[in-house]
């Protein structure tokens, strides 16, 4: 069941069309990637879901009903442009933002202390925000986004500015929050993160929805019938009947890694059967799916 449904959403800013009849179904308890080049309309859609901006037409449903301002309290939003008040102490800032989301002072303090301890930043409580580095401030803002245990989290470029260690920390937290039942909208240009984290995606370009669906389904849809065969043995692959062409075949001390282009769809089992008839040992045989980065470039270029 879709937790968030965007139905025929349109939004204009004067003569500029930001979203043109865009419909999305965001499943409950999954990570949904909202993708697109700069200026495609992603941020506008995020702001509409958050009720920061009102659409010209169309509607957003939250758990099957029109979204209300009360529902917004159940959303945790990490914008791409971070916005902590630089002159405030970190603890005061975090308390203020948590209480804006409906938490009592007691609950906010207790939950924030847990998160600060978890991230190893408990000694930052009395620091001014302006004393923090960009990465340190982003840790604090991530905590303020999730501290009220939102049922929906919207994370816009959450890994931007983090070093690899802290990016991995945030990645693990996102997956843990998903395991706890949260729904996550992840807006990012990092296609590796999309492949690793997202269950489903939608790609928007020039204010239109280009494609939506499961990540693996989309990768298979744009597949090119290539497979990787790792084997040991001296029988040349050319001895196998013509079910494929050989793109590459490297030999490392008798262990071969070959990339094969199959002659048609659904021939993988046939190829494996014929290869096994030769005097070789098959170590692995897998489909090579295109990367999301390549699919992104292809679709954005085609719809430019």
PLM features: residue spans?
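ABC transporter nucleotide-binding domain
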Residues: 172-261
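Residues that scaffold the ATP/ADP-binding catalytic core of kinase and kinase-like folds
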Residues: 70, 145, 218-221, 295, ...
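Short, charged/small-residue-rich alpha-helical element at the C-terminal edge
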Residues: 226-299, 304
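Residues at or immediately preceding the N-termini of alpha-helices
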Residues: 105, 215, 265-268
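ABC transporter nucleotide-binding domains
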Residues: 2-6, 11-205, 211
